[in-house]
Amino acid sequence: MASETVSNHQEKALALLQADAEKILRLIKVQMDNLTMPQCPLYEEVLDTQMFGLSREVDFAVRLGLIGEEQGKAMLGELERELSALHEAFTNKQQ
């Protein structure tokens, strides 16, 4: 019973983290579609704040043992790659 509860908590934690990551990914995709980052510094600030918040959530879940450290790193790494692609796309547009 206890292991079932732990497993349930782990699944819920992962689902919540993935939902938050998906929200950030949608923000990134909107920026990619519009490539308006410098015209909207507030949007970039929101992305940075959301990424920081998610990193804290992931750290907390890892410390509780709800997700593995590698799982958390992979989730954040994917979003960081998307952000990097956004910055690269905008830089290429400016050239």
Curated annotation (Swiss-Prot):
Gene3D superfamilies: SO2669-like (1.10.287.750)
Family: Belongs to the UPF0358 family.
Protein name per its UniProtKB record: UPF0358 protein BcerKBAB4_3775
Organism: Bacillus mycoides (strain KBAB4)
